[in-house]
C-alpha cells in the first residue's frame, strides 16, 4: 500500500486514540481562527487528491467553519404572515447540507476562483469544519492543462451556487446507488411530474 492508502485508513478509524486526539486538538486550533481562512496546504492530502486537488500553481484550499444545527426562519418576532400551516419558525430544516453551505461561503468570498470540491476535516458540538478546493481559472497551469480546461469555461462560474458540486448534487437527489434511484429524469421535479402526469397514448 502507498502512503495515501495508510492515511485513508487512519481517517476511516476516527474513534482510534490517535485520531480522537488529533481531531480534538485541530478543532481547538480551528476555533481560534476566523470562520473562513486560507489553509497553507490540505489537512487531508489523500482526500484532496481524490477530489481533484494537485499540489501545483492555480490550486487553493480554504477552511470554512459552519455552525451546526437547523435553520431558524428569519422573521421579525416570529410573524410569518400566513396560514397556520406555514407558521413554523424554529424546527425548520435547511434543504442543503452544511458542506454545501461551506462551499457557497468560500465561493462568495473568492469570487474570481471556481469551487472544485470540498471535504470534512472536523467537528465539535457547535461547528463543522470543511476544507474547500478552489481553482484559479486564469492561471496558465490550469488553462493549458487538458485535464483542467473544463472548469475554465464560463458555464462553470459559481457552480457551488447552482448545486453542481458533489455536495450540491447530493441534496438535489442526483447520484449513483440506491439512495438516488428515485430521481429519474434529471431532477426531483421532473421525476414527480412524470409520475403525476397521465399519458394516454394513441395505441395502448
From Swiss-Prot:
Gene Ontology MF terms in the entry: RNA binding; structural constituent of ribosome
Keywords noted in UniProt: Cytoplasm, Ribonucleoprotein, Ribosomal protein
Transport keyword on record: no
A Pfam family the protein falls into: Ribosomal_L15e
Keyword Ribosomal protein set for record: yes
Compartments in which it is found: Cytoplasm
Cellular component terms per the entry's GO annotation: cytosolic large ribosomal subunit
InterPro entries found in the cross-reference section: Rbsml_eL15_core_dom_sf, Ribosomal_eL15, Ribosomal_eL15_CS, Ribosomal_uL23/eL15/eS24_sf
GO biological process assignments: cytoplasmic translation
Subunit comment: Component of the large ribosomal subunit.
Family: Belongs to the eukaryotic ribosomal protein eL15 family.
Classification via PANTHER family: LARGE RIBOSOMAL SUBUNIT PROTEIN EL15, RIBOSOMAL PROTEIN L15
Protein name per Swiss-Prot or TrEMBL: Large ribosomal subunit protein eL15
Source organism of the structure: Epinephelus coioides
Amino acid at each position: 500500500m502507498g502512503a495515501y492508502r495508510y492515511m485513508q485508513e487512519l481517517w476511516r478509524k476516527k474513534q482510534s486514540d490517535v485520531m480522537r486526539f488529533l481531531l480534538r486538538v485541530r478543532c481547538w486550533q480551528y476555533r481560534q481562527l476566523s470562520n473562513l481562512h486560507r489553509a497553507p496546504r490540505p489537512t487531508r492530502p489523500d482526500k484532496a487528491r481524490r477530489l481533484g486537488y494537485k499540489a501545483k500553481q492555480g490550486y487553493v484550499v480554504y477552511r470554512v467553519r459552519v455552525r451546526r444545527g437547523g435553520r431558524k426562519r428569519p422573521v421579525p418576532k416570529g410573524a410569518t404572515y400566513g396560514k397556520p400551516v406555514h407558521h413554523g419558525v424554529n424546527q425548520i430544516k435547511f434543504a442543503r447540507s452544511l458542506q454545501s453551505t461551506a462551499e457557497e461561503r468560500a465561493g462568495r468570498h473568492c469570487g474570481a476562483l471556481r469551487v472544485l470540491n470540498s471535504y470534512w476535516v472536523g467537528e465539535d458540538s457547535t461547528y463543522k469544519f470543511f476544507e474547500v478546493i478552489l481553482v484559479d481559472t486564469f492561471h496558465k497551469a490550469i488553462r493549458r492543462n487538458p485535464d483542467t480546461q473544463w472548469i475554465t469555461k464560463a458555464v462553470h462560474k459559481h457552480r457551488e451556487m447552482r448545486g453542481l458540486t458533489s455536495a450540491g448534487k447530493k441534496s438535489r437527489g442526483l447520484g449513483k446507488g440506491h439512495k438516488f434511484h428515485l430521481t429519474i429524469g434529471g431532477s426531483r421535479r421532473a421525476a414527480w411530474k412524470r409520475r403525476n402526469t397521465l399519458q394516454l397514448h394513441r395505441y395502448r
